[in-house]
UniProtKB/Swiss-Prot annotation:
Cysteines engaged in disulfide bonds, as pairs: 177-227
Gene (name only): Esam
Recorded GO MF terms: cell-cell adhesion mediator activity
Protein keywords: Cell adhesion, Cell junction, Cell membrane, Disulfide bond, Glycoprotein, Immunoglobulin domain, Membrane, Phosphoprotein, Repeat, Signal, Tight junction, Transmembrane, Transmembrane helix
Lineage, uppermost ranks: Eukaryota, Metazoa, Chordata, Craniata, Vertebrata
Originating organism: Mus musculus (Mouse)
Name of this protein: Endothelial cell-selective adhesion molecule
């Protein structure tokens, strides 16, 4: 909301502003907080300690000869993007402080300097000191605030050195060096140790990235190379050994690498093959097997029947149709009828019965193999209708 000039609200705000300005001027006149010139911006090294100097004075010393001066002190840290963080306080004679922080002197000396120990990078920021002095009646007679900016520096952490490329004669390689932590950012320098000492500069050296490029390698360039990461507060080193090889050595190394890779692949393949085979055997062992149904044994023909050469009864003719039956010799005084065409269709007269031993039926194939042997060999019997003596199918 914008207030126009001459309104009652504007007059009230003006009165309040003038009153606060007068009170602040009176407070500054009663006491003043001091920070040494040139020490409002400090730098310190991580792990060490630092003192933030500050003290206050009263304007009218003669009116404060009695010991009832009650200061209220607060130190707090302000960092970008964070809420103010209280570091130390002294209120009503009780001091509260975080670990590693303390007052350098007794507060009765009016010296409110703050000591910070075991510094970390996270301790960087703006420290504000607020002092409010009261009398024995609890009335404020002076108040002041001062700021000191602190920057914690970090020496380079031990860097890591590496070699990029295959170092054999005539090729190019790059030596890399990198520190994981440094404030401010580290600068890098490469050198080769004795007996062939050498310090490298640009353009082969990149002091910001920490890389050193070596071109057209030779045997004489072999040796120990040292990288030094350095900033304003410290340094750290690492080294790498360069062994330049001839073509034969390079071929041996390449062959060893390839052979190792091929060997690993073969071992992996054998392991997979063994696992697959074991799994297959396990599955076969776990299968439920059913007994095969025995083949049906069909009756075979008599030994007088003929069988085809392929072992099946595809064409069987009755031996009775092929050969006439054996008749008994005629007795004297008996009549032997002669069969005719018409008598074959009618029932023939009963022939005289001759007592002879019945022929033994032996089922043999033309090759001399029995029916049981054919059944074991897997032959399949085929039923073929037989012919009667009259030539009709039975």
């Amino acid at each position: 909301m914008i207030l126009q000039a001459g309104t009652p609200e504007t007059s009230l705000l003006r009165v309040l502003f003038l009153g606060l300005s007068t009170l602040a001027a009176f407070s500054r006149a009663q006491m003043e907080l001091h920070v040494p010139p040139g020490l409002n911006k400090l730098e310190a090294v991580e792990g060490e300690e630092v003192v933030l100097p500050a003290w206050y004075t009263m304007a009218r010393e003669e009116s404060w000869s009695h010991p009832r001066e009650v200061p209220i002190l607060i130190w707090f840290l302000e960092q970008e993007g964070k809420e103010p963080n209280q570091v130390l306080s002294y209120i009503n004679g009780v001091m509260t402080n975080k670990p590693g922080t303390a007052l350098v002197h007794s507060i009765s000396s009016r010296n409110v300097s703050l000591r910070l120990g075991a510094l970390q990078e996270g301790d960087s920021g703006t420290y504000r000191c607020s002092v409010n002095v009261q009398n024995d009646e609890g009335k404020s007679i002076g108040h002041s605030i001062k700021s000191i900016e602190l920057k914690v520096l970090v020496p380079p952490a031990p860097p890591s050195c590496s070699l990029q490329g295959v170092p054999y004669v005539g090729t190019n390689v790059t030596l890399n060096c990198k520190s994981p932590r440094s404030k401010p950012t580290a600068q890098y320098q490469w050198e080769r140790l004795a007996p062939s000492s050498q310090v490298f500069f640009g353009p082969a050296l990149d002091a910001v990235r920490g890389s050193l490029k070596l071109t057209n390698l030779s045997i004489a360039m072999s040796g120990v190379y040292v990288c030094k990461a350095q900033n304003r507060v410290g340094f750290a080193k690492c080294n790498v050994t360069l062994d330049v090889m001839t073509g034969s050595k390079a071929a041996v190394v390449a062959g060893a690498v390839v052979g190792t890779f091929v060997g690993l692949v073969l071992i992996a393949g054998l392991v997979l093959l063994y696992q697959r085979r074991s799994k297959t055997l396990e599955e076969l062992a776990n299968d439920i097997k059913e007994d095969a149904i025995a083949p049906r044994t069909l009756p075979w023909t008599k030994g007088s029947d003929t069988i085809s050469k392929n072992g099946t009864l595809s064409s069987v003719t009755s031996a009775r149709a092929l050969r006439p039956p054996k008749a008994a010799p005629p007795r004297p005084g008996t009549f032997t009828p002669t069969p005719s065409v018409s008598s074959q269709a009618l029932s023939s007269p009963r022939l005289p019965r001759v007592d002879e031993p019945p022929p033994q039926a032996v089922s043999l194939t033309p090759g001399g193999v029995s029916s049981s042997a054919l059944s074991r060999m897997g032959a399949v019997p085929v039923m073929v209708p037989a012919q009667s003596q009259a030539g009709s199918l039975v």
